[in-house]
């Protein structure tokens, strides 16, 4: 950057010097022009020759002040910081330290402590009473009187008695009776048990037809009324209601009344989706 500025300044200075020299040469050429000599007429009349003055130059070249050219300032070379090197001192060998001689400890035998004889108090033993076992009287088994079997009597044989025939009495002669004609037996058909009249099955009221999701909200509100997680039940019920166009009556069961679409709809995990 400094060199480029220096070169531009030198070029400008040389250019101004050249222009100034050219303007000086032009002014010198105008001054040194020869004066024209007119032909002299008759010597009788000589007009006075006017003294010609050199024309003054109408243009003076501008004088530019010469600025002294400063030599480029060179920066001193930057010396890198010198890291002080600490001289490495050789290791000083320390003389070996002599330890004082270790004296073996003097062993003193322990003085035996003489304990006085401990006087034990006389132990009193209570007399052990002699326990006599109770005399158990021998138990006599109960005497049962001997059972005397009754004497066996021989069976008495009775001679057979001859049957006594009753006296034969001749029945009185009855006049012949005319027998009525035999009627064939009448066959009564089996009586069928009378069944009580069965009441026709009561059909639950059919819910109104579902058209939009707004129609499913009141139906699913009654369906999920007793569910522990009502919000989850409502989302699943509204989806099933919108797809199958039906919600089973009641709060539980009766899925077959909405067909296989409602009963067989599964989640991604394979569980039943519709409540």
From Swiss-Prot:
Tissues expressing this chain: Expressed in flower abscission zone, style, stamen filaments and lateral roots.
Keywords: Disulfide bond, Gibberellin signaling pathway, Secreted, Signal
Single GO biological process annotation from the record: response to abscisic acid
Biased composition (Pro residues): 36-207
GO (cellular component) term, any one: extracellular region
Keyword Secreted among record annotations: yes
Transmembrane segments: none
Superkingdom of origin organism: Eukaryota
Subcellular location as annotated: Secreted
Region (Disordered) residue spans: 34-207
PTMs per UniProt: Six disulfide bonds may be present.
Major site of localization recorded for this protein: secreted
Role: Gibberellin-regulated protein that may function in hormonal controlled steps of development such as seed germination, flowering and seed maturation.
PANTHER family in the record: EXTENSIN, PROLINE-RICH PROTEIN (PTHR23201), GIBBERELLIN-REGULATED PROTEIN 14 (PTHR23201:SF53)
Family: Belongs to the GASA family.
Protein's name in the database: Gibberellin-regulated protein 14
Organism per entry: Arabidopsis thaliana (Mouse-ear cress)
UniProt lineage: Eukaryota, Viridiplantae, Streptophyta, Embryophyta, Tracheophyta
């Amino acid at each position: 950057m400094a060199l480029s500025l220096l070169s531009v300044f030198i070029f400008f200075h040389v250019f101004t010097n050249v222009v100034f020299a050219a303007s000086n040469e032009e002014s010198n050429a105008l001054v040194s022009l020869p004066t024209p000599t007119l032909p002299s007429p008759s010597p009788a009349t000589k007009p006075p020759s006017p003294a010609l003055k050199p024309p003054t130059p109408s243009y003076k070249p501008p004088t530019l002040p010469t600025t002294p050219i400063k030599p480029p300032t060179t920066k001193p070379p930057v010396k890198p910081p010198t890291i002080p090197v600490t001289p490495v001192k050789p290791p000083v060998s320390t003389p070996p330290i002599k330890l004082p001689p270790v004296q073996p400890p003097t062993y003193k035998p322990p003085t035996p402590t003489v304990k006085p004889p401990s006087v034990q108090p006389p132990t009193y033993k209570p007399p052990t009473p002699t326990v006599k076992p109770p005399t158990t009287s021998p138990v006599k088994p109960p005497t049962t009187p001997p059972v005397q079997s009754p004497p066996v009597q021989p069976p008495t044989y009775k001679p057979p008695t001859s049957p006594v025939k009753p006296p034969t009495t001749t029945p009185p002669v009855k006049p012949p009776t005319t027998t009525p004609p035999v009627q064939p037996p009448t066959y009564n058909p089996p009586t069928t048990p009378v069944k009580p009249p069965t009441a026709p099955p009561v059909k639950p009221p059919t819910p109104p037809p579902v058209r939009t999701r707004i129609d499913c909200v009141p139906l699913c509100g009654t369906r999920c009324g007793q569910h522990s997680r009502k919000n989850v039940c409502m989302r699943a019920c509204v989806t099933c209601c919108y797809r199958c166009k039906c919600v089973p009556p009641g709060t539980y069961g009766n899925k077959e009344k909405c067909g296989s679409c409602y009963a067989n709809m599964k989640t991604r995990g394979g569980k039943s989706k519709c409540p």
